[in-house]
Each structure stands twice: as C-alpha cells, then as structure tokens.
Amino acid sequence: WPHENTDWFPYLDDITETFVQIAKAVAHYEPLVIAAKHPDAVCAELEESLSAEEMENVRIYECDNNDTWARDHAFITLIPAAEGSDIPIEGTAVSAAPTEQGVCDYGKNAVVSFEDGDASDYGKNAVASCRLLDFRFNGWGEKFAADKDNLINRTLYARGVFGGERVDYDDFVLEGGSIESDGRGTVLTTSVCLMAPNRNQPMTQAEVEQVLKERLCARKIVWFDHGQLIGDDTDGHIDTIVRLCPDNTLLYVGCDDENDPQYADLHALEQQLKVATDADGNPYRLLRLPMPDALYDDGDRLPATYANFLIINGAVIVPTYAQEENDARALALVAEAFPGYDIIGIDSRTIVRQHGSIHCLTMQYPAECRLAK
C-alpha cells in the first residue's frame, strides 16, 4: 500500500483512491491480503468505501515497503499436478494460469483463513500442498532500492499468512511480471528483460531457460524478443504486452500508427506471436488489444497498456485511461477472451505515472496456499 516514503508521495491522495477502488473490486469476489506500513490508517480508508461483507474479506498486515509492485517481489506459486494428469512434471507454475477447463482454476474458491490469536501458530499447521518460490528481487536490475520489498515474503510467511513450503531461490533474480504460465507446462517471457544487465549475468539465455524449466516445472519456454513499451523501466515485462487467456488465447498489444516509435517493435512482436506454439505444439488464438493514446508525465511517455489486467475469481480488472473509444474496445476484447467473467475497468492514469498498472500491483495465490484450520 502506498505511503509517504514511497515515490507516490506527490500524488498520495490520488493513488490511495485508486488503491481503494482496486481493493473493493478484489474483496467483492475473493479474500484480499494487504501489506501496509500503516495498517490502521489503511483499514480506516477502506471502511469508508467497502461494504461490511467486502471488509470481511480483507486482512491487513504491517510491512514496510520500498514500493508497491507486489507482482515482482511476491512468491511465485507451484501447485502439484492433478492426480492422473498427463503433464509429466512435478507441478505447475501459477503466476498466471488460465486453463482449458476455465480461467484460473487454481484460484477458484481461494481462501486465506485467519482467526484471532497468534498467527504464527498457523505456520506450524499450514497445508503443504503448494510451494512458494521466493526468488531474489533486486529492483529491476538494481535500478531502485528493494531491501524492504525483498523482506515482505519472509515476513508474511513467518506470520503464517500463507501455507505451503517456502523455497528460497535467492541465487536467481526473477520478477513475477516477467513470466506468464498457462499451468500446463508453457511459460512465456521476454529476452529483453531476462537477459538485461544486472540480473543473472553472466548466464547465457540457454542457462536461464534451464533454470526456469527446472524451478517452474515448465516443459517449454517461449521467448519473445520484441515489444518493450516506451517508459517501461522493468526492461520489458511480458505482462505489459502479452497475456494468457482461456482456450489457448493470447491478448496482446498492437499498434496501428506507423508514426508511433513503438510501431516497428510491436509489429515484430506480432510476427513472433503468429508462429508461437505451446508445450504441446498448439498454436495460439490471437486477440489484438488497442494501444492507448500516448500519455506523458513531465514530457516523458508512460507505458500505458490494456494488457496489464488482473484475473480474479469471477472477474477481470482492466486498466483504463479515460479514452472512451480505446477503453471500450479493450474491455470488449477482454470480455471476449474471458466469457462468463465480469469485466471491471479502473482508471489507471495515476498508477501509470509510476510506470506500471493493476497486474503489476498485485499477486494472486491459489486455494492450495490456504492455512489449515
């Protein structure tokens, strides 16, 4: 949650209002865990906007933080392959995993159980049916301070917030926003990010791929070499340009303006998408999201994108930018990709001033991470 010591300070009131909107949307459908420097103040802010039923779904834990991009420092979860599964791996990564059976099967009925008393007691009885992978986060290649953010996983785990086995992978830098997993053995990523300076050098791309396969239980890593948005200081996270959806569908960012400096790179990305296949050799159904009209902050272009949506139980929360035609097209395409799900647009113009959006701010956890009662 943003506070006075984060980069959000110059527009703290505006971003807090946006965070409250996101919290309300999530808590309406599923449990919500918030890490906050000032939990009492956050609780008071939420109580002004959330219903009593929504507040019942909210748990707030005191944690100091450098920034607010939970996607990149939070645990990446592995769940065991279903009994009788034909997937020849130990488990499946669920950083984002729509499946043929439905959207985010790992998240349906997701519950984080909390009761009054010493939370540490729960850690002793946690349901150990999942693995919580704790990779090193170094502020996107040592661009920004990350010491406090790097402690949040351990702090919450020690307090019994999450069940399962914590696996320490501090020897490898990996951000949640840099990968997309279908839960069936395919992981999407970008070479511009994973091979960027100050992450895992001097490892080669082949060596990085082997680590990803072993630790994420993946059968195939699909690398994209194009599509970094102007203003994206993560070096090109996949969750800003290409997203996995049900039925082997990909929502991706396209550009029609040949005068846009991003046009050639996004066109090259589109060509790669057309020939990409999953771990079973199946091609993807492609749905092309519009590019928002350019947004600027102090003359610098911001990485506005509709691809940075968040999938929750029964809904998809989509960033919008007060651009009537583009917003409507994007929401309609997300609805086409996620039939049966509520589509919720949230104005993300304040969020993108810090070069991210809704998916970047959040991390989902599967039902298998719930604590034993």
Give the role of each language-model region.
Residues A82-V127:
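Intrinsic disorder/low-complexity segments
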Residues W1-G84, G107, G123-K373:
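The feature marks the mature, well-folded catalytic cores of soluble enzymes
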